[in-house]
């Protein structure tokens, strides 16, 4: 068993036939999508958009190649706005905090990732998808949302 799927019981028959991937179109999320295509007949490639995001059409570049590589898997590309989720996480006082605390204000990247994962959970609930993956790599475990020592104990309560 690889490290990437150590937390998943792949023998559990209740995983369903589909998986979702938070998909940017980069090499890490494309690899995650390919790994999901090896196990599921349907893979939902979910790209989130909000004000300030550029080049959100880039993910479509690799989809046709994945369809050719995994002809038995159906890939669905979803481009989903998630701005209100980001605003809820980032908070309504971000400009005030920037003025008050300057560079000590929290970096929005963490809030953005949390909002994407939150919106991904909603997507999965709406579409009866029980498995979701992203292209997070171990080198980013300095972010709380990508560090199992921080996140997993809270989820396992």
Language model region names:
Residues 39-42, 67-76, 155-157:
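Structural alpha-beta junctions
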Residues 61-65, 95-97, 150-152:
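Short, hinge-like loop/turn segments at secondary-structure boundaries
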Residues 48, 82, 134-137:
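Short loop/turn segments at strand-loop or loop-helix junctions that form parts
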Residues 44-46, 78, 133:
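Hydrophobic/aromatic beta-strand patches that form the interior of the parallel beta-sheet core
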Residues 1-12, 123:
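Phosphate/ATP-binding catalytic cores across multiple sugar-kinase/actin-like superfamilies
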